[in-house]
Amino acid sequence: MKVITCEIAWHNKEPVYSLDFQHGATWKIHRLASAGVDTAVRIWKLERGPDGKAIVEFLSNLARHTKAVNVVRFSPTGEILASGGDDAVILLWKMNDSKEPEQIAFQDEEEAQLNKENWTVVKTLRGHLEDVYDICWATDGNLMTSASVDNTVIIWDVSKGQKISIFNEHKSYVQGVTWDPLGQYIATLSCDRVLRIYNTQKKRVAFNISKMLSGQGPEGEARSFRMFHDDSMKSFFRRLSFTPDGSLLLTPAGCMESGENVTNTTYVFSRKHLKRPIAHLPCPGKATLAVRCCPVYFELRPVAETEKASEEPSPELVNLPYRMVFAVASEDSVLLYDTQQSFPFGYVSNIHYHTLSDISWSSDGAFLAISSTDGYCTFVTFEKGELGIPLKEKPVLSIRTPDTAKKAKNQTHQGSSPGSRSVEGTPSNRTQDPSSPCTTPSPTTQSPAPSAIKDSPSAIPAGKSPLPQPSEEKTLQPAGQNMKAPQPRRVTLNTLQTWGKTAPRRINLTPLKTDTVPNPQPNSGTAPSTEEVQPEAPGEPPEEPPELKRPRLEEREGDAQNLAPDDSSKTV
């Protein structure tokens, strides 16, 4: 492991707030994006020098933001770069393959001539009212989430450039957001000292974590302490992260109280138990502010080496058939951990004069980049095999996103009758736990079904009644077994649905039949009863429809009022 702080004016010696490596199988070079107070986003190329240290080469200057840029994040494929800043907008950049540079009014001609790559803005996402602090992509690259000073978190449809949902439960700045690699959760961390975990399918809060029990008081009462730092923490960011397989959630800015002592820490949450942390990673120095995981999976170390290295047994973060490495950045240092032990195996300090701001791993795990508000960046390089032996094949993940859930829902509705399958699917969906970690894509197609089924009774008075029609046809068929011709009329006439069910209504309507149909009186046998039904159908609508439409309109308005809160909560 070698550390070097490059003497480069990354952003005109202004504070550097964020950096991110480009991942993806199609890219042959280590491309790095950086952003800072000078309102620019810059692209760099990294190589390993003969001495094993990093060599940096400038590639492009992306000038479009009007204020400081707080975060840059490449999409999972590396094709699109998202940047968010104090101007409350998110820009989506894409590299332009054409050799002719794009005419940009935001940068000088001299700066444009220095660009070796041409990047253009393909989308501008507007929705936040204040500074954008953090961005995280979904695993499939179709969706993205952002956190802002306006206390909100927004889920974006990247292809359409539109907002899908807005989460506004936080009471203060949202300084970090991460998307579960399996697509089930979105976790946010705010300076209101609350960690909120949202369910992406239900689009609502699944867990609120803010306090932890610390034992009993002198009188036997339960004591608790706040798990996260308040707004006095000297950092704009609290960048939390899921592990690449989604098994663990790592949250910085933690504080553990033991009597009068307060220890800065990073909490570790298990996917199977998100209500409280399973472990914490203490930081001897200042508060932690960012956690980033190496994208490479490694083989487990031999048990003998683990036992020799640890004097006492580790609290065992998680029992996995592989090992994952992650870095935790505090205000003045970086600690390196893996999932096989609870204490760090690496420690980097005394590299910057001011607070650190962000960290990022290269796609092969060879580089760890560190940015600081002093205007410089540091690179930690690892030799081949220094972190461990990489797995030959990555684990296969079953990914769920709101977009795929909607598509599956539409497919089930298009390919099945609305009456039978929707009712049959309801009990099975209610018995399953949608928040269970070991879920497959098949339950996700059924997870939205309960909400649609609950809404179906309220939608019946509005004019579309898929469920009652089959049942009404079954009740009318015994009354007219020998009448095959009038059946089309009964299907098209909605006014026959109410009085055709019960016999008392037919008895009350016998005087109307004699008044409205005087001509067919000579036919008074059993056949006239069937013939009278035919002329009544066109004769009764002037009287029956007002009785049926009025309650339907009233019910429709009532249902609209009742459905308004539910729909708003789903779309938020």
UniProtKB/Swiss-Prot annotation:
<feature type="modified residue" description="N6-acetyllysine">
    <location>
        <position position="501"/>
    </location>
</feature>
<feature type="modified residue" description="Phosphoserine">
    <location>
        <position position="436"/>
    </location>
</feature>
<feature type="compositionally biased region" description="Low complexity">
    <location>
        <begin position="431"/>
        <end position="452"/>
    </location>
</feature>
<protein>
    <recommendedName>
        <fullName>Chromatin assembly factor 1 subunit B</fullName>
    </recommendedName>
</protein>
<dbReference type="InterPro" id="IPR015943">
    <property type="entry name" value="WD40/YVTN_repeat-like_dom_sf"/>
</dbReference>
<feature type="modified residue" description="Phosphothreonine">
    <location>
        <position position="440"/>
    </location>
</feature>
<feature type="compositionally biased region" description="Polar residues">
    <location>
        <begin position="411"/>
        <end position="430"/>
    </location>
</feature>
<keyword id="KW-0677">Repeat</keyword>
<comment type="function">
    <text>Acts as a component of the histone chaperone complex chromatin assembly factor 1 (CAF-1), which assembles histone octamers onto DNA during replication and repair. CAF-1 performs the first step of the nucleosome assembly process, bringing newly synthesized histones H3 and H4 to replicating DNA; histones H2A/H2B can bind to this chromatin precursor subsequent to DNA replication to complete the histone octamer.</text>
</comment>
<feature type="modified residue" description="Phosphothreonine">
    <location>
        <position position="510"/>
    </location>
</feature>
<comment type="subunit">
    <text>Subunit of the CAF-1 complex that contains RBBP4, CHAF1B and CHAF1A. CHAF1A binds directly to CHAF1B. Interacts with histones H3.1, H3.2 and H3.1t.</text>
</comment>
<feature type="modified residue" description="Phosphothreonine">
    <location>
        <position position="401"/>
    </location>
</feature>
<dbReference type="InterPro" id="IPR045145">
    <property type="entry name" value="PTHR15271"/>
</dbReference>
<dbReference type="GO" id="GO:0000785">
    <property type="term" value="C:chromatin"/>
</dbReference>
<feature type="repeat" description="WD 4">
    <location>
        <begin position="169"/>
        <end position="208"/>
    </location>
</feature>
<dbReference type="InterPro" id="IPR001680">
    <property type="entry name" value="WD40_rpt"/>
</dbReference>
<dbReference type="GO" id="GO:0006281">
    <property type="term" value="P:DNA repair"/>
</dbReference>
<dbReference type="GO" id="GO:0005654">
    <property type="term" value="C:nucleoplasm"/>
</dbReference>
<feature type="repeat" description="WD 2">
    <location>
        <begin position="64"/>
        <end position="103"/>
    </location>
</feature>
<dbReference type="InterPro" id="IPR001632">
    <property type="entry name" value="Gprotein_B"/>
</dbReference>
<keyword id="KW-0156">Chromatin regulator</keyword>
<keyword id="KW-0131">Cell cycle</keyword>
<feature type="repeat" description="WD 6">
    <location>
        <begin position="301"/>
        <end position="347"/>
    </location>
</feature>
<feature type="compositionally biased region" description="Polar residues">
    <location>
        <begin position="511"/>
        <end position="529"/>
    </location>
</feature>
<dbReference type="InterPro" id="IPR029129">
    <property type="entry name" value="CAF1_p60_C"/>
</dbReference>
<comment type="similarity">
    <text>Belongs to the WD repeat HIR1 family.</text>
</comment>
<dbReference type="Pfam" id="PF24105">
    <property type="entry name" value="Beta-prop_CAF1B_HIR1"/>
</dbReference>
<keyword id="KW-0234">DNA repair</keyword>
<dbReference type="GO" id="GO:0006335">
    <property type="term" value="P:DNA replication-dependent chromatin assembly"/>
</dbReference>
<dbReference type="InterPro" id="IPR055410">
    <property type="entry name" value="CAF1B_HIR1_beta-prop"/>
</dbReference>
<feature type="region of interest" description="Disordered">
    <location>
        <begin position="403"/>
        <end position="572"/>
    </location>
</feature>
<dbReference type="GO" id="GO:0005737">
    <property type="term" value="C:cytoplasm"/>
</dbReference>
<keyword id="KW-0007">Acetylation</keyword>
<feature type="modified residue" description="Phosphothreonine">
    <location>
        <position position="426"/>
    </location>
</feature>
<feature type="repeat" description="WD 1">
    <location>
        <begin position="11"/>
        <end position="54"/>
    </location>
</feature>
<feature type="modified residue" description="Phosphothreonine">
    <location>
        <position position="502"/>
    </location>
</feature>
<keyword id="KW-0539">Nucleus</keyword>
<keyword id="KW-0143">Chaperone</keyword>
<feature type="repeat" description="WD 5">
    <location>
        <begin position="228"/>
        <end position="279"/>
    </location>
</feature>
<dbReference type="GO" id="GO:0033186">
    <property type="term" value="C:CAF-1 complex"/>
</dbReference>
<feature type="modified residue" description="Phosphoserine">
    <location>
        <position position="456"/>
    </location>
</feature>
<keyword id="KW-0963">Cytoplasm</keyword>
